[in-house]
């Protein structure tokens, strides 16, 4: 090898040079893979948001300082549910450096990110117009989504959503102070430990100072009582998509009364409605029949007589409904783990319900592209 060839030869190892490029000539859209799941989801979201333009316009004054566009607010909140972002502060941090997040929300690479407090203030405006529910309906009414929904077979269920309040905040309504506690070092403190043993606490006499809408409730015998709200879902049985979501006070009859309200609003005469053993009561079965629906609830015949008999259970459709009904646990599981609703981050039933409905819509948006791809 001659000396000239040796000097001109370049080493295989690349150099770890850090150089800042002032300008970038690649659009954000080119950074996102063509088969990324968020591409289909964004198309669905944009189509649904376009139908809400008039509803958005009613929430804002004609004159004034421009605020965060409501479309971008909702897209950002959907990302918070999709990727389990714990707080709005963390969401703004991710929007600052995550190009995928910027692309989905509609920000360019150079657009400034909003302050977390400003974001929350603008978000709360959407609560006044019940935008979360309107957005869910808009998604379900999209032509490509409507064809996926069953109009005759449904399932209902409820779950507890733990409130953002500790048991120490559950104090007597009459203002009497609870017995003083002691801290770890034996002295009292602002957040001193409490011994609740032997103390009778009921919703009639006590309420939470942190979230007065929360109720002390346990889902079943032997379960832990906690401050919570009760969330309700109605699912269509063809593809397991959520068609209604509501949040109410946690009590022993809320599941059945709310289910009847959802049936009346969404199910036509001749429909079937599946439910677990908690719905096998005379009042719920009678309520379904009054609305022209057949109750396909699981029989609860332990030390009691079931509210339905062989006239219902002998049909093949009953067995199918009891199998399909179990799928309603899937959205509840996703909403609590991925969607972050195992313990809500918000206070007040109105705001908690708003996020409950939006998270249910986020679950639908995760499922719809997969169903569309499977059905062709």
Annotate the PLM regions.
Residues 33, 37, 64-72, 87, ...:
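Secondary-structure capping and boundary motifs in well-ordered enzyme cores
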Residues 75-82, 357-367:
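Short, hydrophobic/amphipathic alpha-helical patches that form generic packing surfaces
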Residues 83-90, 239-241, 340-344, 363-376:
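Short helix-capping/linker segments at secondary-structure and domain boundaries
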Residues 175-180, 185-196, 277-350:
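Helix-centered, glycine/charged polyanion-binding patches within enzymatic domains
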Residues 93-96, 106-290, 298-300, 363:
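Polybasic low-complexity intrinsically disordered regions
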Residues 11-22, 26, 38-148, 163:
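Basic, low-complexity intrinsically disordered segments
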């Amino acid at each position: 090898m001659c000396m000239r060839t040796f000097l001109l030869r370049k080493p295989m190892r690349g150099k770890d040079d850090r150089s800042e490029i002032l300008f970038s000539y690649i659009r954000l859209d080119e950074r996102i893979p063509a088969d990324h799941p968020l591409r289909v989801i964004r198309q669905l979201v944009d189509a649904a948001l376009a139908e809400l333009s008039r509803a958005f316009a009613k929430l804002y004054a004609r004159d004034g300082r421009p605020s965060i566009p409501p479309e971008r607010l909702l897209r950002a909140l959907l990302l918070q549910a999709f990727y389990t972002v714990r707080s709005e502060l963390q969401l703004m941090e991710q929007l600052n450096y995550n190009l995928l997040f910027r692309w989905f929300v509609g920000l360019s690479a150079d657009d400034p990110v909003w302050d977390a407090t400003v974001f929350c203030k603008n978000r709360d405006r959407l609560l006044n117009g019940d935008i979360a529910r309107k957005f869910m309906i808009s998604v379900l009414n999209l032509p490509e989504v409507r064809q996926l929904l069953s109009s005759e077979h449904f399932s209902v269920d409820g779950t507890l959503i733990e409130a953002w309040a500790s048991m120490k905040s559950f104090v007597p309504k009459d203002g009497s102070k609870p017995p003083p506690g002691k801290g770890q070092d034996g002295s009292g403190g602002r957040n001193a430990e409490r011994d609740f043993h032997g103390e009778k606490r009921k919703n009639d006499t006590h309420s939470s100072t942190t979230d007065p809408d929360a109720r002390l409730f346990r889902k079943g015998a032997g379960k832990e009582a906690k401050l919570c709200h009760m969330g309700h879902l109605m699912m269509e049985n063809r593809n397991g998509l959520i068609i209604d979501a509501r949040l109410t006070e946690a009590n022993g009859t809320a599941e059945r009364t709310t289910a009847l309200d959802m049936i009346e609003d969404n199910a036509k005469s001749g429909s079937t409605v599946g439910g677990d053993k908690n719905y096998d009561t005379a009042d719920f079965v009678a309520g379904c029949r009054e609305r022209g629906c057949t109750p396909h609830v699981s029989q609860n015949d332990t030390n009691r007589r079931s509210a339905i008999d062989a006239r219902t259970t002998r049909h093949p459709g009953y067995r199918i409904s009891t199998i399909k009904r179990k799928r309603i646990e899937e959205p509840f599981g996703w909403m609590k783990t991925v969607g972050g609703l195992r313990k809500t981050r918000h206070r007040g039933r109105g705001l908690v319900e708003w996020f409950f409905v939006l998270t249910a819509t986020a679950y639908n948006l995760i499922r719809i592209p997969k169903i569309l791809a499977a059905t062709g």
